[in-house]
């Protein structure tokens, strides 16, 4: 048996986690002196309230070694193989903690740690594929091999409503944040080679910006793997999300269109009103 585990930044819904029998290892979110578990003891809306009140971005940290060992140990004792996914190594030490836990359990030969080189449902796309393979009886080595092949084909991007949260987190300077607010600029953030990079900038109200962003990807979307696409957002209004879904449905490409809410870690850095369309290219 192969067990699939991911850290909480995969942003998969509780329904998907249950459907595919995936275990989630929460990262930590620190609001001042208080520490919370991503997806378990705090919500994104609570994070926004705290961040706006204190004019700063919460700190996030990897799971502890003890927590990781506690999650892994029962599966190791049962003789399972484990394939676990972490947020990009350039963004967190989550993957390193997983490797340390494998060493502490003397199970390096049965625990495979995959650096997703991604975030949010860019990880989730890989995790779901791995879980399907595990259910179909594939070995950990077979799953890991396919994941390494798929990683460069994951297309993860999003547009943000406000640059305030990126500025608070040190991901853009004060001048850019102020100009973005005055000019109503909304950057497209793309994940490439495990890092985030701002590419095209859109101007206008966020609802129209989101639709422009999605329609600009039409050619790539039509060439995507048809299994599934994620509309991942951090609290966009329902009408906007529905408009994105309608556009994706009109393409006639995807068998499954999923709408997860971004988790606490991603929401901490991007703020409310962020939306991304994530898929795997053929």
Residue ranges and their predicted role:
Residues 3, 9-23, 28, 34, ...:
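Mixed-charge interfacial surface used for oligomerization/domain docking
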Residues 35-106:
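Class I S-adenosyl-L-methionine
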